[in-house]
Structures are given as structure tokens and as C-alpha cells.
Amino acid sequence: MRRVGQSPSAPVSRVIRTGTKGSAGRLAFGPVDDRVYVGYAGKDAVADRGWLLGHFKDAGDPRHSEAVEIKWSVHPRADARAEWVRGEERTALLVLISGRFRVELPGRSVLLEEQGDYVVWGRGVDHSWFAEEESVVLTVRWPSVPGYAVAAEGGAGPRA
């Protein structure tokens, strides 16, 4: 499989999968070389609580970024954020991949119910969320802020 404009001699990387679509038999590839990483979000996300890309990846990893963080989240029905995120330092984009997902913002509730629905909120906007159905969402945050994490109890803030 070649993309338009790609040299016929250029190597093609594929994610190797075993089993059938949706089965647990998928295998994530790893680094192809020091500048390319091929993976499977459903498996790779487990390593960093859903985060696929950001400052927290090793500096030599192509998924390391000081500018942006990307998260793949699978939420069971009725999953809810334990506490509101307050004092957020980043801008965020949340895109619904599947399901039905509600984002709570001060004075406003946003329901994402069709694939591709999204919401963006800026720095300093408090937020919370609730999965009305089993949902898969992709979150992009910027900048990637070192020392910021969700505490085990569900609150968010700088790491001690």
C-alpha cells in the first residue's frame, strides 16, 4: 500500500494484528526507528493511564512532546470524573470516537453524541465529565505541563 506522492521504494510500516477485529489478539508495534513509532492506542494507552504522547515519554521516544499531550480513553457506561478539575493550566480538545459522553463546564453541559463531536475549552476553565454510554474519546491538551497529574483519589493538580 502506497500513499500518493510516496516513492515506490519507500518501506511501508503496518501494525501487525492477530485474531479478528475487536479481539484481544492485536499487537502494538514499537519503534520502527528512532523517529517513527507505530502502535495501537487501545494497548499503548494502558502504559500511561491513557496518555499516548507528551512530556512524560522518554526524550528519545518519537511520542515525547513538550508542546502537546494526547490521550486515548475508554470509559464504561456511567463512568464519571470523581471531582471537577480546577485551575487547569492547558487548553483542551476532546473528540468523541464512539458512545455518548457529557462534558460539564461552568454554567454549561455539552453532550457529545455523534462520532466526531468535539468540545474545546481554554486555560482556566474548570471541567468534569460523565460517560452516558460506553465511550471512547481522544483528548488533546496543550502545552504538555510537567508535574501535573490526576491524583489517585481523582483530583487534579501539580505532582508533589
What residue spans do the PLM features occupy?
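Ligand-binding loop in jelly-roll beta-barrel domains
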Residues: 123-148
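Short, conserved beta-strand element in jelly-roll/cupin
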Residues: 86-102
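Short, surface-exposed beta-edge/turn micro-motifs
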Residues: 90-93, 116, 134-135
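A short, N-terminal "cap"/entry segment at the start of jelly-roll beta-barrel domains
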Residues: 1-77, 81-84, 157-160
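Short acidic-glycine-tyrosine-enriched beta hairpin
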Residues: 107-123
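Short peripheral tails and domain-boundary helices/loops at the edges of structured domains
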Residues: 144-160
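Short histidine-centered beta-strand/loop micro-motifs
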Residues: 61-64, 81-88, 105, 111, ...
